[in-house]
C-alpha cells in the first residue's frame, strides 16, 4: 500500500470516529485540515482525540455486546464493497479505508431511508469526503451491494447488527 492509500485510509478512520462521537467539532476541524496540504502538527491532536474516543467505546463494553460495535460504522457496506471487488476481479480496487468511507455514505443513506437521520446527511458526507480526497462513488450498483451485504458472515439469523448515523456525533446500533 502506498503512502497516499495509507493517508486516505487514515483520513476515513479519523472522520468515521468523529461521526460516531464529536463534542468539540473535531469533525469540522478534521475536514479543514484533511482538505489541505498534509499538516502533521495540526492532525496530531485530532488523532489523539480520536484514539481516546475509540478507547472509551471499547472500555465501556468489554464483553462486545453493543457499544463496541459502534466503531464498525461503514464496515458492513465497506466489507461488501471489498467482497464485490474481489469477486469481480476489479483492477485497482478501493483500499479497506476507502471502501469503509463509501460504506459510511451508504450507512447514512440507509439511516435516511429508515428515518433515523434527516434527509441530506448522506449528501453532506459524500461532499465532505470528496472535499478531503476520499473516493465517494460506489464501484457497483445498489442491488449488487445489497447482494454482497447478504454475504456478511456476522449475520445472525439473517439479521445484521448495523450502525446507523442519527447525525454527526451520534450513532445507534440496530438489527436489520
Regions from the language model: what does each represent?
Residues 4-71:
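Carboxylate- and glycine-rich phosphate/diphosphate-binding segment that chelates Mg2+/Mn2+
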Residues 98-106:
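Small-residue-rich helix-loop
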Residues 85-97, 113-119:
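Phosphate-handling active-site elements
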Residues 12-16, 116-176:
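C-terminal charged capping/lid subdomain of soluble metabolic enzymes
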Residues 13, 83, 105-113:
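Short glycine/serine- and small hydrophobic-enriched flexible loop segments
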Amino acid at each position: 500500500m502506498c503512502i497516499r492509500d495509507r493517508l486516505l485510509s487514515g483520513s476515513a478512520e479519523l472522520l468515521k470516529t468523529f461521526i460516531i462521537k464529536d463534542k468539540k467539532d473535531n469533525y469540522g476541524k478534521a475536514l479543514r485540515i484533511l482538505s489541505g496540504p498534509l499538516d502533521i502538527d495540526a492532525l496530531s491532536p485530532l488523532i489523539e482525540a480520536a484514539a481516546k474516543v475509540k478507547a472509551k467505546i471499547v472500555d465501556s463494553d468489554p464483553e462486545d455486546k453493543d457499544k463496541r460495535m459502534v466503531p464498525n460504522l461503514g464496515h458492513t457496506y465497506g466489507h461488501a464493497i471489498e467482497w464485490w471487488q474481489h469477486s469481480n476481479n476489479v483492477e485497482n480496487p478501493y483500499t479497506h479505508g476507502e471502501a469503509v468511507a463509501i460504506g459510511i455514505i451508504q450507512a447514512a443513506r440507509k439511516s435516511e431511508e429508515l428515518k433515523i437521520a434527516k434527509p441530506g446527511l448522506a449528501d453532506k458526507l459524500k461532499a465532505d469526503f470528496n472535499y478531503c480526497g476520499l473516493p465517494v462513488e460506489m464501484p457497483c450498483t445498489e442491488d449488487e451491494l445489497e447482494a454482497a451485504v447478504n454475504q456478511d458472515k456476522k449475520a445472525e439469523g439473517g439479521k445484521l447488527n448495523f450502525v446507523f448515523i442519527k447525525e454527526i456525533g451520534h450513532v445507534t446500533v440496530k438489527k436489520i
